[in-house]
Amino acid sequence: MTVSGPGTPEPRPATPGASSVEQLRKEGNELFKCGDYGGALAAYTQALGLDATPQDQAVLHRNRAACHLKLEDYDKAETEASKAIEKDGGDVKALYRRSQALEKLGRLDQAVLDLQRCVSLEPKNKVFQEALRNIGGQIQEKVRYMSSTDAKVEQMFQILLDPEEKGTEKKQKASQNLVVLAREDAGAEKIFRSNGVQLLQRLLDMGETDLMLAALRTLVGICSEHQSRTVATLSILGTRRVVSILGVESQAVSLAACHLLQVMFDALKEGVKKGFRGKEGAIIVDPARELKVLISNLLDLLTEVGVSGQGRDNALTLLIKAVPRKSLKDPNNSLTLWVIDQGLKKILEVGGSLQDPPGELAVTANSRMSASILLSKLFDDLKCDAERENFHRLCENYIKSWFEGQGLAGKLRAIQTVSCLLQGPCDAGNRALELSGVMESVIALCASEQEEEQLVAVEALIHAAGKAKRASFITANGVSLLKDLYKCSEKDSIRIRALVGLCKLGSAGGTDFSMKQFAEGSTLKLAKQCRKWLCNDQIDAGTRRWAVEGLAYLTFDADVKEEFVEDAAALKALFQLSRLEERSVLFAVASALVNCTNSYDYEEPDPKMVELAKYAKQHVPEQHPKDKPSFVRARVKKLLAAGVVSAMVCMVKTESPVLTSSCRELLSRVFLALVEEVEDRGTVVAQGGGRALIPLALEGTDVGQTKAAQALAKLTITSNPEMTFPGERIYEVVRPLVSLLHLNCSGLQNFEALMALTNLAGISERLRQKILKEKAVPMIEGYMFEEHEMIRRAATECMCNLAMSKEVQDLFEAQGNDRLKLLVLYSGEDDELLQRAAAGGLAMLTSMRPTLCSRIPQVTTHWLEILQALLLSSNQELQHRGAVVVLNMVEASREIASTLMESEMMEILSVLAKGDHSPVTRAAAACLDKAVEYGLIQPNQDGE
């Protein structure tokens, strides 16, 4: 059978003017045989235009497909063959021709289906069989090729750089695949070695947001934890080019560039992490140089005109993360000193820029706060007075340069810069305030008729009132001015700031009930106005933030706290504001919540010391009656009902430098207060509090981490850890809990950590291994000797659960230690709960390690009395544990069994074996059966 041509008719010349379908078909066949494929195609097309039967139509379409194959027009060949198959599904010629067309089009998976159908219709046709074998081989080769990373990379770049694929789903999928491929080390290396960085540079130059995002995210995979690739990437793209992407208007692109630069910083500072990456392909002589070039470009970006406000904020965020030392124990702060010398003035320029009216530098509502945080981090990273003095000198010189000889605009810029310093390194800010004429200018500008001048001056006055000394000065000189502004100004933005100034001065006494700056009731009036502005949706978020600032100060007063938590609308507005992009409000929100929950540190003063202070006429702070525990508990419940946990979870998720270590500490304090009562913990877990506490416990100040870890411990004790911390998150809880075992933590924190670890150790072997890896066992053993009975008991219970691990069993089995002796002795203590824990540990160990059974008689001469006491206990659990230990000892050695049977133990076991079908009865009976098996005792006549 021939399948390559349309047919084999008798050759005869074409008849001009022939009109019948049959005649035209035969003419087409003749032309096809003569190699005139165009003429044949025309004849078949003409025949189709006549009144052809469905069968004739199928043949004609099939023949047209053969012509298109010869003419190498494979798309049309596939179309014609498909039309023939629609007319006759069993047409093997049409199926074969379509398979040929599909093969040429590269659609091998579809071609093989048609060939398989041909073979099923004509199993003995060798042409079909051979074609199927050939195409099968092609498919295997294509699979091998397509599975190789090189092919993937080449294919994806072809799609991404193809101008005709603009905006297609194919292009989007290729960009996603490229990003995923770069996350694997092998994929990242292939992309890098296939000139991937140069190709990615072309994507960046195209300017399309989606392509730029794909390119930046792919570069993240290439540079992640790899120094040499990072340096090579910076060399190819240009450090300036990479940094400049931060300044684009697109927020998504700017954030992606920020992430890339963060990865580059980490790679340059840390190098390759062993175990995660292979050997580097190049040797880096001095990565510190590349690091400085990168930081230098970031500093230049801060003051570059045309950079977006979001880009400037991202640059500040990168500097905050990259420059200061991670730990003050690291002696090298040279990078900080270099940044102060090279870029302090540039940072101050951002801090002194005004958002409204816009100046030369575009800034956001968060820019000044980010600059303040960076300045604070740099100042805290200094080691000696000489370094701090240099910092002060540079700041003062910069402020003087604007304050002197620059007119009113210069004075405004200088005062704004002072405000930035007061929010960050306040020591530098206070010194700047003492410069000649600065404070006087602040007071004078408060009375200005220009709104922007008043805003700058009033904000500076508010920040200056932070210190008690400064507050006293302002109370004497500026209160009347602030009151006039509050009462007379027509601008809400001025009034609300003046109100915050009054709030701050009114709270200068803190929680001390006896120290009030204003008359009785004044703070309540101020708080009421703050709540009113907070709830006003017509006012912009930036202005409403100041209302929260005011409440953060006023909530030191317990009367204000009580009214605030009763105001559901104000709480709702507060929580909504914390979720907005106005991130600078986070610290004020957290401060207000700390005050409402009384979660700051408070130690009850010694009554004798109080009397002594009164006798010496020293001031003694007094607690407000409404700050007593009953009032605090009521406020906590109202906050929980208002949805405080959900708001705090959103705050913790914030990726912003505004979420400082101090802010995280405040949130940790509030969480700890929220979980104090057992009945409230379910609400906290249900609203996501458990997962929010983990990052708080792993990062922040030491106090904040400890508070968050303690809150985690409380949740782990009273709720199912697998439900509270689902999936892999449960393993992240272990480290914070172990940190509470350190000696610098309180006894309560030690106790709660031990109880929480006990629960975790009872869940799975993987969790026990995690506890062992965190080196918790030596600390737990130490607490087993603690004098406090509850801590000693909790440590013993924890060790009992850990004893299920092979490594812990090895510790007990090792020679030359008293671990086993301690458990035996604790099994004889009067504390029933301690007895139960120790006996449980003994039962576990003797079951898992029979060799320990022979050592029990050696650790103490009172071992037999202790075991007998366990079996004679009125507590079923103690009896059962004791019976299991005895059974393990009997089964371990005939010699030990003989010693036990020669004592009163046999009588005790005999009595217990006659009980009901309880676990104790079964264990006692098993002991006696084993003794009978050894021939140590004889069964009685009843066979018992």
Swiss-Prot record:
SMART domains, sorted: TPR
Disordered: annotated span: 1-21
Residue positions, PTM Phosphothreonine: T15
Claim: Phosphoprotein is one of the keywords in the record: yes
Subcellular compartments: Cytoplasm; Cytoplasm, Perinuclear region; Nucleus
Consequence of substituting A77D: Abolishes interaction with HSP90AB1. No effect on interaction with PGR
Consequence when changing R98W: In OOHE; uncertain significance
Sequence ranges of the TPR repeats: 21-54, 58-91, 92-125
Name of protein: Protein unc-45 homolog A
Designated gene of the protein: UNC45A
Biological process per Gene Ontology, one example term: muscle organ development
A GO molecular-function annotation: Hsp90 protein binding
Keywords: Acetylation, Chaperone, Cytoplasm, Deafness, Developmental protein, Differentiation, Myogenesis, Nucleus, Phosphoprotein, Repeat, TPR repeat
Matching PROSITE patterns: TPR, TPR_REGION
Assembly, per entry: Interacts with PGR isoforms A and B as well as with NR3C1 in the absence of ligand, and with HSP90AB1. Binding to HSP90AB1 involves 2 UNC45A monomers per HSP90AB1 dimer.
Primary subcellular site in the record, as a coarse category: cytoplasm
Tissue-specific expression: Detected in peripheral blood leukocytes, bone marrow, adrenal gland, trachea, spinal cord, thyroid, lymph node and stomach.
InterPro entries documented for this protein: ARM-like, ARM-type_fold, TPR-like_helical_dom_sf, TPR_rpt, UCS_central_dom
N6-acetyllysine PTM sites in chain numbering: K70, K483
